[in-house]
Amino acid sequence: MGFSAPLSKDQASLLDERSREIFRRIVEGYLDTGEPLGSRSLSRLLPMSLSPASVRNVMSDLEELGLIYSPHISAGRLPTQTGLRFFVDAFMQVGDLPADERANIDRQIGPVAGHEQSLEGLLTEASRMLSGMSRGAGLVLTAKNDVILKHVEFIRLEPTKALAVLVGDHNQVENRIIELPAGISSSQLTEAANFINAHLSGQTLQELRGQFQTQRTELQSELGMLAQDLVERGLAIWAGDNEEGKLGRLIVRGRSNLLEGLAGEEDIDRVRMLFDDLERKENLIEILNLAESGSGVRIFIGSENKLFSLSGSSLIVAPYRDEENRVVGAVGVIGPTRLNYARIVPMVDYTAQIMARLSRKQR
């Protein structure tokens, strides 16, 4: 896709009615078919009477502004990444999700929660639903803080290092190597693990850590200083004080949707790069960071999203939050830049609301 510098507000305000109409038709044609629109086709589509020559003059002006480009000689025009962003910001109208689509989401996700299946089942169904309705890849992930603890163990590896093992409520296992306080004994390792296990009672990492912080005096009376230090180190690592510890569960459904309508080797390479990106844990942690940085649905087009910039993909993502307004996960759709943004944005927003409500019930 063509790339140019961002369009300033002053430049955008210079577009007259026919320029805006021609630009809008080019973008909508691209989002609908992926094909460029030429001057003859545009002259027939426009509500005003303009000759193909007049349309070409307007297209030339739009090209100078960096809003459209020609993919090859004698072809029609396609929107640049800057053009798509301008369209999303200035033209796109996002309304409420239609009642039938809300009902469809409720029908697909609701029964999973109603039958008290695992949170894993809820995540899977939400991802599958987003994929099916958007024709992109549906993505649902959770932050590590949302994992409910079942068992904790510390296994000494070296005098100054131990393997910290966490088992979640769905038997998912996380291993982390942690630095041990100097001089801590094997019995103190066991004491620290037993203390955590005795206080779990179905709490998340963040809840357990908060409890320990508010009951520091009681903690000091029950544990020695070294064991207390170890407990706090283990919880800090698991609860995501470092970036690696932030990601909990990830489910992506609908990768096959991204293979539909590929036109050539370049498109195949683009999708292959996207698949590779989805396997990198650091990229998925960044998705959580992107979701946390905004209060609602966020749209990242092409290289605006450094995660998937090489594959020329767009990401529409929204966080979902717990009762204390902490981000505990994100839902989204990944696909080509010609996603139906106006339709997918309210879909992702509504799904995030549903996930926030249902995930609390799963706790």
Swiss-Prot record:
Keyword line: Repressor, Stress response, Transcription, Transcription regulation
Pfam family, one: HrcA
Taxonomic superkingdom: Bacteria
SUPFAM superfamilies: GAF domain-like, Winged helix' DNA-binding domain
GO BP terms, alphabetized: negative regulation of DNA-templated transcription
Its biological purpose: Negative regulator of class I heat shock genes (grpE-dnaK-dnaJ and groELS operons). Prevents heat-shock induction of these operons.
Protein family according to the UniProt entry: Belongs to the HrcA family.
Official protein name in the record: Heat-inducible transcription repressor HrcA
Gene name of the record: hrcA
